[in-house]
């Protein structure tokens, strides 16, 4: 398989499939795709926040339940993940499920706020 063929296959993957691929590559090769993001985060934020983030730099945003306003939650999930309507609906209906994995604390808090405003119950891990 050529590099172009691999890239073509990756381009056709959904966001959730890409997340699974990244996780599998991280486990297979013992690396972390979130490390460059974690290194860049303290530079953008205040210096005082850096020591607190050293303990846990990578967070998963988990949808525990959609709540009463499921349609609003589906819209936000589509916005966050880039999934199609059916994929986002399936994801929301199969909660608890990860919405986004390996994100910075700042991004995780922002996503949690958006989803909770739409009516979802969210957990950060």
UniProtKB/Swiss-Prot annotation:
<keyword id="KW-0687">Ribonucleoprotein</keyword>
<comment type="subunit">
    <text>Homodimer. Part of the ribosomal stalk of the 50S ribosomal subunit. Forms a multimeric L10(L12)X complex, where L10 forms an elongated spine to which 2 to 4 L12 dimers bind in a sequential fashion. Binds GTP-bound translation factors.</text>
</comment>
<dbReference type="GO" id="GO:0003735">
    <property type="term" value="F:structural constituent of ribosome"/>
</dbReference>
<comment type="function">
    <text>Forms part of the ribosomal stalk which helps the ribosome interact with GTP-bound translation factors. Is thus essential for accurate translation.</text>
</comment>
<comment type="similarity">
    <text>Belongs to the bacterial ribosomal protein bL12 family.</text>
</comment>
<dbReference type="InterPro" id="IPR013823">
    <property type="entry name" value="Ribosomal_bL12_C"/>
</dbReference>
<dbReference type="InterPro" id="IPR008932">
    <property type="entry name" value="Ribosomal_bL12_oligo"/>
</dbReference>
<dbReference type="InterPro" id="IPR014719">
    <property type="entry name" value="Ribosomal_bL12_C/ClpS-like"/>
</dbReference>
<dbReference type="GO" id="GO:0003729">
    <property type="term" value="F:mRNA binding"/>
</dbReference>
<dbReference type="InterPro" id="IPR036235">
    <property type="entry name" value="Ribosomal_bL12_oligo_N_sf"/>
</dbReference>
<dbReference type="GO" id="GO:0006412">
    <property type="term" value="P:translation"/>
</dbReference>
<dbReference type="Pfam" id="PF00542">
    <property type="entry name" value="Ribosomal_L12"/>
</dbReference>
<dbReference type="GO" id="GO:0022625">
    <property type="term" value="C:cytosolic large ribosomal subunit"/>
</dbReference>
<protein>
    <recommendedName>
        <fullName>Large ribosomal subunit protein bL12</fullName>
    </recommendedName>
</protein>
<dbReference type="Pfam" id="PF16320">
    <property type="entry name" value="Ribosomal_L12_N"/>
</dbReference>
<dbReference type="InterPro" id="IPR000206">
    <property type="entry name" value="Ribosomal_bL12"/>
</dbReference>
<keyword id="KW-0689">Ribosomal protein</keyword>
